[in-house]
């Protein structure tokens, strides 16, 4: 599970069916940070050195990512300096679009866009948009508002921050984390990222989960170069991936494990590895179902927390645990990704084999 919070733009809306186990809110500056199949249960998304051997994770990290372009959340009505109501972007700009240019100037962030609007000499602007795989241009009449500002009536976002868990590190310093993608909370789209970083974090408090109300962990993240651990390069449905530059700072205890093939995984005893305070520990779970051909790749494992200590402290799986490694028979078999809303002792996981294939995709062998 991931806890996410937007850095700029309007606040995220709560989503109904599932929420990433990435601590559901990303934080800026110094901040704390199902499978819709036969079960029909609500779920929340919870973040190689030869022979598929990796260093096992379980450590929480702060995450900061910038969007590739400026993400459009919605359009809205605005009031002009004449007191009339206007909605200039309605039907022209859609939620989920990315603004990549204005009046032939490339823009990467919210600041670029507001600066261009502040210098506007005429009302008509041409926005260059990316909509899915298509690029298009739309003409919009900006509205002059009180104070001589021009506005387009568009809610936008250009970054996301939060807290999640590292799953593993390969022999060439590539990491896998979360086990699920980071989606925008307002539009539900998988966010296109232009880049990002991982940072040190410390867990400050735990909110215990209850039926119908998933718990969460809160951490302190200081986004500066002294606390930077590495680079985020990919945001996929199977997790986030990139490079760790400060390996010793993150992997204080370096434990090599082999990644299990899907066919090796079975129901029965297993453990998850996570940090609820100052140290990473293993907690007992049961694997109750294994589906190598799951419709959603990040829900191939169904698990139940059985460890009395973990149940007492968290109630089960909580937001912030996305990416927590799942171990069985001495091997890394997967990572926690989602929690059932109506039963926080149960959740989903992704196969570690799938994550390893994703982190290696596009790399030279």
Name each model-derived stretch.
Residues 6-56, 235-284:
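Interdomain regulatory linker/hinge segments that flank or connect interaction modules
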Residues 68, 95-96, 266, 322, ...:
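Short, flexible surface segments
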Residues 84-98, 119, 316-320:
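A short glycine-leucine-enriched loop at secondary-structure breakpoints
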Residues 143-315, 319, 328-329, 337, ...:
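Serine endopeptidase catalytic core focused on the charge-relay Asp
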């Amino acid at each position: 599970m991931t806890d996410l919070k937007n850095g700029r733009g309007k606040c995220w809306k709560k989503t109904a069916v599932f929420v990433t186990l990435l601590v559901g809110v990303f934080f800026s500056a110094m901040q704390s940070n199902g499978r819709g199949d036969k079960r029909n249960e609500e779920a929340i998304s919870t973040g190689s050195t030869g022979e598929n051997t990796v260093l096992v994770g379980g450590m929480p990290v702060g995450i900061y990512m910038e969007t590739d372009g400026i993400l459009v959340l919605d359009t809205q009505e605005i009031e002009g300096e004449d007191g009339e109501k206007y909605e200039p972007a309605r039907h022209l700009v859609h939620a989920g679009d990315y603004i990549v240019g204005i009046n032939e100037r490339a823009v990467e962030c919210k600041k670029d866009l507001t600066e261009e609007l502040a210098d506007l000499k005429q009302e008509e602007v041409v926005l260059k948009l990316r909509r899915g795989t298509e690029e298009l241009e739309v003409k919009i009449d900006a509205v002059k508002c009180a104070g001589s500002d021009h506005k387009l009536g568009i809610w936008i976002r250009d970054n996301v921050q939060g807290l999640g868990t590292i799953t593993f590190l390969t022999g060439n310093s590539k990491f896998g984390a979360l086990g699920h993608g980071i989606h925008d909370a307002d539009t539900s789209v998988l966010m296109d990222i232009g880049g990002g970083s991982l940072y040190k974090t410390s867990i400050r408090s735990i909110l215990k989960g209850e039926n119908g109300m998933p718990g969460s962990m809160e951490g302190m993240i200081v986004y500066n170069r002294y606390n930077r651990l590495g680079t985020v390069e990919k945001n996929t449905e199977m997790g986030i991936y990139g490079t760790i530059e400060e390996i010793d700072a993150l992997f204080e205890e370096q434990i090599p494990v082999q990644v299990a093939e899907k066919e090796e995984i079975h129901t029965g005893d297993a453990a998850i590895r996570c940090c609820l305070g100052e140290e990473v520990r293993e907690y007992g779970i049961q694997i109750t179902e294994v589906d190598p051909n799951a419709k959603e790749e990040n829900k191939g494992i169904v698990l139940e927390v059985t460890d009395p200590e973990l149940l007492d402290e968290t109630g089960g799986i909580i937001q912030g645990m996305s990416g927590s490694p799942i171990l069985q028979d001495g091997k890394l078999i997967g990572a926690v990704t989602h929690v059932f809303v109506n039963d926080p002792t149960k959740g989903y996981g992704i196969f570690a084999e799938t994550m390893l294939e994703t982190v290696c995709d596009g790399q030279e062998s």
